[in-house]
Amino acid sequence: YAQHLVQQQVSSGDAVYVHLPRSLSLYLVLLAAWKAQKVYVPLDPTLPLDRLRYMIQIVGSGTIVTTDEYEHMIDVSLPRLLLRQLEEPCSERPFTYEPSLRVPAYILFTSGSTGKPKGVQISHRALAAAIKSWKIMLPYTQQSRLLQLASPGFDVSLFELCLPLSLGFAMATAPKDILLTDLEAAFRALRITMADLPAALAALVHPEHLPPMEWLMSGGDMVDERVVREWGTPPQKLINAYGPTEGTIGNTLG
């Protein structure tokens, strides 16, 4: 994947627009973009087309990675790579990977609730610092299993991917409609031991119905009092998180 991105003849630090739904392919393209020293910019296919166009207009040059199904959804004049093309053998010799903390890691957009969405660029240095903090503050073992639920345009999705990859435990997920049909059943089927849920979804899960949980994290809105009672009583562990997109991910945990 990364070799194909390098062959696009774009500069280090240019954008790779990942126009894919939550899937293993999305995670692979994200990691390939970083290996190729490109900037990951998620384009959630569920967002309105006008918003996707606006995001591309703000960020500028780059390559769109998408599928045959989504290829014609965005009518902008940028190079495109189809997912099936990334999976083809590459004739070029492997390139030398030289990681740099100075290269931007990703660009995410704010919700735009107070005006137009704003693009926020975060460096690998800032992301690495966040991961180091999570390692210190969050309990985990090699048997931990973190739920990946957040949509790719939200910074929580990067928390859900980078934490297990960096610390050496498992991430588990399923199509969002399946997860939300019966969240507790999904926790049991996937053997989830830790999760970061929006306040509204945190209210739908009860510790007595789940596998033994290491912690439940929630933020972004006021958590229901019942959730605090159920999850804030040992041996349960409730973590309240807050952090704007501009501050990397989860600036405060309590």
Mark where each language-model region is:
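Carrier-protein-dependent adenylate-forming modules in NRPS/ANL systems
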Residues: Y1-A128, L138-P139, G168
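Conserved acidic residues
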Residues: R53, G62, S144, T193, ...
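Alpha-helix capping/helix-boundary segments
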Residues: L47, E69-E71, I178, A200-A202, ...
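Gly/Ser/Thr-rich phosphate-binding loop
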Residues: S166-M171, T193-D196, A202-G254
